[in-house]
Amino acid sequence: MFRDYMAHVSYNYDSRYLADVVFSYSGSGKLPTGDKYRIYPAVSVAWVASNEQFMKRFSALDYLKLRASFGITGNDSRLSYDMDKQFNGGGNSYIFVGTSSTYGLAQGGFPSTGVEPEKEYKANVGVELGLWKGFSMQVDAFYNRRKQIKGESSGIYSTVVGRGMPFLFNGEVKNYGGEISMGWQQQLNHFGYSIQGNVSYAKNEIININEGYHPYGYMYYTGHSIGQFYGLIAEGLYQKEDFDAQGNLLPGAPVSTYEAKLQPGDVKYKDLNEDGKIDNYDHCYQQNTTLPEIYYGFSLGLNYKNWGLKANFQGVAHYSVWNTLASVYRPLYGNDKSISRYYLENRWTETTPNARYPRLTTLSNNHNYQNSNLWMEKGDYLKLRVLELSYRLPTKLTEKMRMSDCRLFLKGMNLFSIDHIDIMDPEQINAEYPSSRSYLIGINVLF
């Protein structure tokens, strides 16, 4: 057990100038003996400009605050006593004494040196604004840099040593982005309304992951984003005119190493290194990312006397999904022998040469089912998460029933989605069932 020591100093001058300093001295049992503690500081400053005397002349201004912060945090969750030697039992057993057999021990992975917890350097600047007794806005921009990330070293060391290689602690990723939220609310006698919205953008870039050698620059993960798609570039489907009378590809077309003989309706891939072959050296990192870069949402509210109506919307953008559900997108592939109507209607045939998906076959076809952008679709969506109609009983009536409040409501959830995928929920693309639509009737009572 390790004690953590923390100090916090807060400064507030006339509710105008604010500052906080936090200092943490934290230990971890997963670090080497004699080197188990690390220092993690953080500082934040703010200026509430609306409290300045010279700002009082702006009658529309309710609140204005400028702030900035910087801090360092640590994370040892991925550490696993990596500095210790490992010995593995097993293999053949032998009898040395009596009739009991004994297994031998062999050195496992090499111990790691320079074991460090992951560190994240976080910087943030923001503005908070209030106007006209009803409008509010908050804007934030951030930049984070994660360092000392634990990673495999097998990519940079030879495998001929016969033992598991030590981990390295020099992985690095940067994250940056921003968020903006705005809202307006107003009450006019018996009628009131409100609208709120927010949008955030976040992107990451891999600085170092200890990659081994790749013969082509487009094969390196470094410099790309976590979740960025890796695979072949599909350029369409082969047509009958791409083959000669004997069924062979015309001269100049790259030969597939995944399938001995291609046919019309098979996927046409780009030969990136122009060596006349389609193989693993033609895989590359593409623009598609399987992690949304933009999240957004907005809510609307109306009230009139005892009636209320509210709606919450949520969506994502800059997002791609990889369609790998065999029963829908890869018929007769592997152990799944079903064929979806969607695939039948969108597969290649001689009468549908511009189809989206390759020809249907009962035979194995490793060429068509390689990881490629053919199976990627735009995953952006906007969903109505909640729609609720409510009625609050009059006070005179609730008092007679000895209740302080009584509210009746009808609520619907996941009522509709606007997206680019015909038959699947982009939020649950590889699940058997989409997000469920549900309806609730309820009552809230306070006594």
Give the ranges of each region predicted by the language model.
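Extracellular/periplasmic, surface-exposed regions of secreted and cell-surface proteins
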Residues: 1-229, 367, 371-447
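Extracytoplasmic gating/loop element in the C-terminal half of outer-membrane beta-barrel translocons
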Residues: 28, 264, 316-408, 412
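Conserved small-residue
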Residues: 171, 187-290
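Conserved SET/PR-domain catalytic core that frames the SAM/AdoMet-binding pocket
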Residues: 206, 281-282, 292-299, 303-306, ...
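Glycine-rich, aromatic-lined ligand/substrate-binding cores of catalytic
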Residues: 289-323
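C-terminal extracellular loops and terminal segments
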Residues: 167-174, 213-229, 285-301, 329-345, ...
